[in-house]
Amino acid sequence: MDWEEVTKLEENEYKRGYDEGILKGIEQGYEEAFLFGLEHAYNKYLLAGEIYGRVCFWLKEENSQHPKIKKAHRHLEQLKSLLESLPTNNELEETDAGFDSYWNKITAKAKVVSSLLGTKILPAEKIDANDGFE
């Protein structure tokens, strides 16, 4: 080891550690983001499936004669249509609305149906209140 290497040892080790940290951060960041997205998508689609099941149940022939369901029939059909058109892939064309806009329409329509039927459809607490960031 010559004198110049000795004097720059700390600087070289710092740079090497910094570069290694950047690479590890990029690698782990993608993995964490993927898992975070997967978890939140699962929760939202699970709730969408539950709402869809309730809507299908209410729209059945024997249930559709109930006065409250008769009153909410049009809204139930619209909610069912929204749930059936919910995007299930990440490749959306520019003209298509994204998942969040569909989700906002679904929750708004579910609230209308909920008030008309006098039953709770959505959970009381917000599903993504803090989006995982505390």
Curated annotation (Swiss-Prot):
It is found in: Cytoplasm; Nucleus. Residues 17-53 are annotated as: deca-GX3 motif. It holds the Pfam family Yae1_N. GO terms for biological process: protein maturation; ribosomal large subunit biogenesis. GO terms for cellular component: cytosol; nucleus. It comes from the Eukaryota. InterPro entries: Essential_protein_Yae1_N (IPR019191), LTO1_adapter (IPR052436). May form a complex with YAE1. Belongs to the LTO1 family. The complex LTO1:YAE1 may function as a target specific adapter that probably recruits apo-RPLI1 to the cytosolic iron-sulfur protein assembly (CIA) complex machinery. May be required for biogenesis of the large ribosomal subunit and initiation of translation. This is LTO1 family protein C191.08.
